[in-house]
């Protein structure tokens, strides 16, 4: 594997899952593979799970690890080409990227959507500059339009907990005080559409995701109807994608907050969320603390998804 930015990069899902469950049984099985190989993790945005689980995955494989928070300690970076750099940014990304590539073997990048220009975000400008100019294999630690390490962990978790071959999986929008990226819902939808699950997306009108991610999923504007008979509930907030509303909050309707009311019409569904989660905005205390909440095993599987991805990137090194 030469990059990991989307579901297509992992190839056949059944073999990726087999590898994940093998590593889950013995996460140090390939501890020699990464000897004298260096992972560089670059964060343009905050992180807890991605930062810790990806570092742990690298250690599982015997790698050296370097972590850089671009906005703390490094020079402020200009990212636009053609800009006269007479402002507060002393360095351009187009120099910084190949320099960082000199010091490592594999690069992970977190760079969220900026919500200033939809094309800039949806062309994955920052991530693609790392792919083009670093000279190293690059993987996404959540970029502008996807979060594949999260989605792979979500799939592993559903496969672990499902009680039927083709579970009904419902992704529901929920309210949040800030406009959050579409990367997690886009990516979850992309991975769910790559399975044979019964996948439904539910959100208020105006929160339609980009069609290339919705794919063949059923979209249901009535949340209670969507929840009927569900086996898994995946809750997430996202800002509007469509038209002039890009990056905007259209609703903070707390009727969409996942509570016992909605969970009561499911098939005793498991509750999932990528975390961090705003309690009593996205989900009530009772639901996220219930025996059906699997948000912690879901977060634990981030170590497994990252170990599989790093293993395949190391194996792909010349
Ligand atoms: C894994 C989630 C990261 C980010 N969450 C926040 C709070 O910014 C998001 O919603 O994309
Ligand atoms: N789910 C996830 O990626 O969490 P962090 O933003 O804390 O890394």
Swiss-Prot record:
Q: Which superkingdom is the protein from?
A: Bacteria
**Reactions listed under catalytic activity:** N(2)-succinyl-L-ornithine + carbamoyl phosphate = N(2)-succinyl-L-citrulline + phosphate + H(+)
Question: Annotated site (Key residue in conferring substrate specificity for N-succinyl-L-ornithine versus N-acetyl-L-ornithine), which positions?
Answer: 90
Would I find Nucleotide-binding among this entry's keywords?
no
Keywords from the UniProt entry: Amino-acid biosynthesis, Arginine biosynthesis, Transferase
Q: Which GO terms describe its molecular function?
A: amino acid binding; ornithine carbamoyltransferase activity
Question: Which residues participate in N(2)-succinyl-L-ornithine binding?
Answer: 142, 176, 236, 278
Involved pathway(s): Amino-acid biosynthesis; L-arginine biosynthesis
Look up the EC number in the record and give it.
2.1.3.11
The answer to whether keyword Transferase applies is yes
One biological process term from GO is: citrulline biosynthetic process
The residues the record assigns to binding carbamoyl phosphate are 47-50, 75, 110, 147-150, 274-275, 302
Its EC top class is transferase
Q: What does this protein do?
A: Catalyzes the transfer of the carbamoyl group from carbamoyl phosphate to the delta-amino group of N(2)-succinyl-L-ornithine to produce N(2)-succinyl-L-citrulline. Is essential for arginine biosynthesis. Has no activity with either L-ornithine or L-aspartate as substrate. Also has no detectable AOTCase activity, being unable to convert N(2)-acetyl-L-ornithine to N(2)-acetyl-L-citrulline.
**HAMAP family linked:** SOTCase
Quaternary data: Homotrimer.
Instruction: Name the family the entry cites.
Output: Belongs to the aspartate/ornithine carbamoyltransferase superfamily. SOTCase family.
Q: What is this protein called?
A: N-succinylornithine carbamoyltransferase
What organism does the record attribute this protein to? Bacteroides thetaiotaomicron (strain ATCC 29148 / DSM 2079 / JCM 5827 / CCUG 10774 / NCTC 10582 / VPI-5482 / E50)
